[in-house]
């Protein structure tokens, strides 16, 4: 229907069009100077030292795990309440994903669940900054230091998120996403930030065929023709067309996230009169990026199942999302791990629903969602 309200819509405007035109007019549309500008901008945003732009956050996760030497027989701890790409990358490297439970009300992986899963085979910990809120990094990094295990932060939801006064990605290694529904987007893309120069060099090589140089050299205005392959790599570089859009979006980040926060505040106020339960906020000091606004739809409390609510909203022209169906309940993973049970993850996986939330959402759009929720709750 023409007036369908989507769950998400990218906030694009004249700035993004101008950025694309600049790249097209330059004659250099693949990986080039705009990538280097984007990497420098993310170092400034996060406060970290190095940044490597990639074609997607999934690509970033793949080469980050490879750069750590993750392989056959290794274990990587991550919550099941995440998008399956993380699990897929672990499995495709021959390693074993060790999925752990999350806090029932914040859906954050906890240090207690992580520590209980650590074995001599554990080679990495991947906490997820869920829905735009930060995980408890101090406690998680303390575990990593105590056991000598690297931490890779899944920051796909966390552009604009801060933890105890520091932007996510200020230390260690973190991976951000520029997918179409994220807080800033360039259709597809991602970036890895890190404080380790050797690790950054490995990422640059792995993302571009295993060459010993970056995909674009500032001095030569292209790739050095004498570049050699140091080890087999991938083609995960980001075109400058995408990087230019991401840069234009990044300049708007504060305004985009402020609008998201305002809509989230309205949702919280409206939920006081509705049976649907929003997620709780973490107790530690933070700034929430409000990538998602998630409610839990418990049939005993709401008189309707989550799936029925989503279907009913769709008939009213309102889109919703599911973030996420627990990874261990997906066909491949439930067959590989048939005895795995994660009670709080599973309870939420059956009940969570993401409501429309995007910067260009109008007051009329918001009122439409709340009116529909009242109508459904009153049936």
Curated annotation (Swiss-Prot):
One Pfam assignment: DegT_DnrJ_EryC1
EC number: 2.6.1.87
Domain of life assignment: Bacteria
Keyword line: Aminotransferase, Antibiotic resistance, Lipid A biosynthesis, Lipid biosynthesis, Lipid metabolism, Lipopolysaccharide biosynthesis, Pyridoxal phosphate, Transferase
A GO CC annotation given for this chain: membrane
Enzyme class: transferase
Name listed for the protein in its UniProt record: UDP-4-amino-4-deoxy-L-arabinose--oxoglutarate aminotransferase
Taxonomic source organism: Salmonella choleraesuis (strain SC-B67)
Gene it is expressed from: arnB
């Amino acid at each position: 229907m023409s007036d369908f309200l989507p769950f998400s819509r990218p906030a694009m405007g004249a700035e993004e069009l101008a950025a694309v035109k600049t790249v097209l007019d330059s004659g250099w549309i693949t990986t080039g100077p705009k990538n280097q500008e984007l990497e420098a901008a993310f170092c400034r945003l996060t406060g970290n030292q190095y940044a490597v732009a990639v074609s997607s956050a999934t690509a970033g996760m793949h080469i980050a795990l490879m750069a750590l030497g993750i392989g056959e027989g290794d274990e990587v701890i991550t919550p099941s309440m995440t998008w399956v790409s993380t699990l897929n990358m672990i499995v495709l490297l021959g390693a074993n994903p060790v999925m752990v439970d999350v806090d029932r009300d914040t859906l954050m992986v906890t240090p207690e669940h992580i520590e209980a899963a650590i074995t001599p085979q554990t080679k990495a910990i991947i906490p997820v900054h869920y829905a735009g809120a930060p995980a408890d990094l101090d406690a998680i990094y303390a575990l990593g230091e105590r056991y000598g295990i690297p931490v890779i932060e899944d920051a796909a939801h966390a552009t604009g998120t801060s933890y105890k006064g520091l932007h996510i990605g200020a230390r260690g290694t973190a991976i951000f996403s520029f997918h179409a529904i994220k807080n800033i987007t360039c259709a597809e893309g991602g970036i890895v930030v890190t404080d380790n120069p050797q690790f950054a060099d490995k990422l640059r090589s792995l993302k571009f065929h295993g060459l010993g140089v970056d995909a674009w050299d500032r001095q030569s205005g292209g790739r050095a023709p004498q570049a050699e392959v140091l080890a087999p790599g991938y083609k995960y570089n980001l075109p400058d067309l995408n990087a230019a859009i991401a840069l234009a979006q990044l300049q708007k980040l504060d305004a985009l996230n402020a609008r998201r926060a305002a809509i989230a505040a309205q949702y919280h106020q409206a939920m006081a009169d509705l049976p649907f339960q929003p997620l709780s906020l973490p107790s530690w000091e933070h700034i929430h990026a409000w990538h998602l606004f998630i409610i839990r739809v418990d049939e005993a409390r709401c008189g309707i199942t989550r799936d029925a609510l989503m279907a009913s909203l769709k008939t009213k022209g309102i889109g919703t999302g599911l973030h996420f169906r627990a990874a261990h309940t997906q066909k491949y993973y439930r067959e590989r791990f048939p005895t795995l049970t994660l009670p709080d993850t599973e309870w939420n996986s059956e009940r969570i629903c993401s409501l429309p939330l995007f910067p260009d959402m109008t007051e009329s759009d918001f009122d439409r969602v709340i009116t529909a929720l009242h109508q459904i709750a009153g049936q």
